[in-house]
């Protein structure tokens, strides 16, 4: 029998499980306050659904051996979008849903072997609302949810925002393969890759300008307006940041607009964002989301119903980030019911039921103790604070 978990999998101890539950419950309370209903998408889906119309690469999905192509979900948005367009099709829009559960991501380890990463996720999806109203609610909800996490200044939280329309504007002068190479270089902030393309000097300098055009949102928008003129995407972002700025300031969250920012999964067709915090070792992404209208359309939605936005929190990463700030519940007083040679286990179990009826946590010492002192010495090992001694 293998004594180690599979590569990428983790055994969580009781405290880690409790902290995950506490974080999930905090977020769930916020979702409910905002009128979101809980759903539970399946862990196993058809590969066609999980790939989200090509937005998620096959190598990111853990495949199952089955009669039909199946896999474990690498995220929950595609499954919830499918449900919204089928089982929940007749429900009125806006359709507000939230879910929490485990996701599974496949990656290649340094030595070349397959590694499966298992993570707990919690998030919301909002269907049937066009820009920019949906984004206004979504990011306002994000800030409300983040507030319950009680991030501190040492985490240096930063909300990085992009928009696929901004990348489209940058890519307008370029065609075909060159367009994709430039896009990849910009996304990865790879100046050397841009140089290797041997572009005309004016185009190269303009791309370098875009590469460095990131920072305070309103300043960046002003620079982009000077380059591209009046654009609906810029107007929407202007309105959105005017709404977000005071919310972010209240929580000490830095806002950053980056026209070249694009996430790993190519789900998004509009606003994209991720919330980054500084851990003791390195930056960590604790939330991400955006607009994914194309995905909803692929699920069969038409017209206004083909609209969706959402975000998700990475619970395990948040737990590790907040280990010093958030603690497990104060130790619950636990009674150890112990018995001596003159009593029996049956008596102890009956006594335990007495405590349980009063709502008191109690455990039974399953072997008889020599005397009261022997029973008392076992309190610490059993995680108990009081002793109920039976000797007759």
UniProtKB/Swiss-Prot annotation:
Can you cite a GO biological process for this protein?
histidyl-tRNA aminoacylation
Question: InterPro entries this protein is in?
Answer: aa-tRNA-synth_II, aa-tRNA-synth_II/BPL/LPL, HisRS-like_core, HisRS/HisZ, HisZ
Q: Localized where? A: Cytoplasm
The record's keywords, sorted A to Z, are: Amino-acid biosynthesis, Cytoplasm, Histidine biosynthesis
Example GO CC term: the record gives: cytoplasm
Q: Which molecular function GO terms apply here?
A: histidine-tRNA ligase activity
The further comment given in this record reads:
This function is generally fulfilled by the C-terminal part of HisG, which is missing in some bacteria such as this one.
Please describe the quaternary structure of this protein.
Heteromultimer composed of HisG and HisZ subunits.
Q: Which family does the UniProt entry place this protein in?
A: Belongs to the class-II aminoacyl-tRNA synthetase family. HisZ subfamily.
Its annotated function is as follows: Required for the first step of histidine biosynthesis. May allow the feedback regulation of ATP phosphoribosyltransferase activity by histidine.
Q: What is this protein called?
A: ATP phosphoribosyltransferase regulatory subunit
Give the species this sequence originates from. Prochlorococcus marinus (strain MIT 9313)
């Amino acid at each position: 029998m293998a004594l180690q978990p599979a590569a990428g999998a983790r055994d969580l101890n009781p405290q880690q499980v409790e902290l995950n539950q506490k974080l999930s419950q905090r977020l769930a309370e916020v979702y409910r306050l905002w009128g979101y209903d809980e759903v539970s998408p399946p862990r196993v889906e058809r590969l066609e659904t999980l790939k989200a119309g090509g937005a998620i690469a096959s190598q990111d999905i853990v495949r199952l051996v089955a009669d039909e192509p199946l896999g474990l979900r690498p995220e929950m948005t595609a499954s919830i979008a499918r449900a919204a367009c089928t089982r929940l099709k007749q429900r009125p829009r806006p359709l507000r849903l939230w879910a929490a559960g485990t996701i599974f991501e496949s990656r290649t380890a340094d030595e070349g072997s397959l590694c499966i990463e298992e993570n707990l996720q919690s998030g919301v999806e909002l269907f049937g609302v066009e820009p920019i109203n949906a984004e206004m609610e979504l990011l306002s909800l994000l800030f409300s949810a983040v507030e319950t996490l009680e991030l501190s200044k040492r985490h240096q939280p930063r909300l990085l925002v992009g928009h696929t329309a901004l990348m489209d504007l940058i890519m307008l002068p370029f065609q075909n393969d060159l367009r994709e190479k430039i896009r990849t270089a910009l996304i990865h902030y790879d100046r050397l890759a841009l140089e290797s393309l041997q572009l005309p000097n004016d185009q190269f300098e303009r791309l370098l300008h875009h590469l460095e055009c990131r920072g305070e949102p309103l300043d960046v928008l002003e620079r982009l307006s000077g380059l591209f003129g009046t654009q609906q995407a810029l107007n929407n972002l202007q309105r959105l940041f005017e709404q977000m700025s005071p919310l972010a300031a209240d929580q000490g969250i830095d806002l950053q607009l980056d026209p070249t920012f694009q996430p790993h999964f190519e789900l998004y067709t509009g606003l994209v964002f991720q919330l980054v915090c500084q851990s003791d070792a390195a930056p960590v992404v604790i939330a991400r989301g955006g607009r994914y209208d194309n995905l909803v359309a692929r699920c069969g939605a038409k017209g206004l119903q083909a609209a969706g936005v959402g975000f998700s929190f990475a619970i395990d990463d948040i737990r590790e980030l907040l280990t010093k700030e958030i603690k497990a519940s104060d130790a619950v007083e636990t009674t150890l019911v112990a018995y001596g040679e003159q009593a029996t286990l049956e008596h102890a179990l009956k006594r335990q039921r007495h405590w349980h009826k009063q709502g008191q946590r109690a455990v039974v010492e399953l072997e008889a103790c020599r005397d009261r002192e022997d029973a008392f010495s076992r309190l610490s090992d059993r995680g108990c604070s009081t002793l109920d001694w039976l000797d007759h």
